[in-house]
Amino acid sequence: MKDFSFEKVKMWIKQELVLTIALLLGCVSSFFNTPKMHYIDWDVLAVLWALMVVVAGLKTVKFLDWTAIELLNRCATYKQVVIALVGLTFVSSMFVTNDVALLTFVPLALVIGKTIKMDMPRVVILQTLAANLGSMFTPPGNPQNLFLYAHYGYSALGFFKVMLLPTVLSVIYIGVIIYFKRNHPLQLELPALEKPDRKLTTIYLVLLALNVGAVLHLLDKYIALAITAIVVLVVNRKLVKQVDYSLLLTFIGFFVFIGNISNTSVVSYLRDHVLGTTEGTYLAALVSSQFISNVPAAMLLAGLTREADALLLGVNIGGLGTLIASMASVISYKLFAAEHPYQAGGYLRMFLFYNFVGLVLIGFVTYLACIVNYINYLDVSQFRELSEFLNW
């Protein structure tokens, strides 16, 4: 019985590795510094919970599935099918997060792959790229954006201005890959889903808009949370159980850890000498994301740097690269490997190729256009201020 329990614990730790690390860091660091309640950003947790419960509602009415099938049945060529699958993933990830977009549209792609001949590894990889790159354009697109948006007090316009260039570059990169795909006519006849309940769908879409508005500072977060909680408890209280509470606990663990170490000498050194520059922060975010994933990287580095734009760009573009750079990539890999176990190795090789090419291209162009130009702007501004001072 003890062995069985130990195996269950091992399996849980394996499944919730990031949560385990976050809680360990939070607990261990608390032995050296007494944690305080204000370390935890309750605003972020409130918005995250509300968004997750609303997205769970949209999943229950199969709104995204129905929309996808209606669109796909209108496609007349292979390339149109690929564009539809990838495009739906890209756009939806901006509002329902990259994880949910992949959990919705990758299984649909795998089902289509059983009815027509498709290059399934490439299609799923393109969907993964679309989810990770599309989600970076909006604050609610992924957890790291939601956290950084609140942590640094971004305005909606300021956030979109920072993320516009890498998003455009992402569209170009994915578009070029699809453009060189062979094309041929086909006719999909996917079984139609029952039309989603209009009343419930409208309620969940209104709640989604309400909470996106709260993220963008158009509405008080706790008013949006209260409305969402009341409506969900009345309409379908089972949705409360479908929230990813492990993600919320992960955030709490990192909040406590960051608060505990924020005033240590090591952190002060890193803040002043490594992450005190725009370039250093950008590169640190890119590299650390490859090894610990971009959500933990964002939360850890945010406590060490004031270079908000560089960190935001770095952890989002850093979602490209290794399989664990973005946990959303792990989701699509598991879905594909479960359906095509003998192609898992080939999938990984192709995944790494497209991801690292995208990381280098998008990362380098963004570095030149945003990071270097920003540094040059600072240099010019400082020189102008010095000249004015000397003339005075």
Where are these regions (language model features)?
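Interfacial loop-to-helix junctions that mark the boundaries of transmembrane helices
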Residues: K8-K14, P35-V44, A156-L165, E194-D197, ...
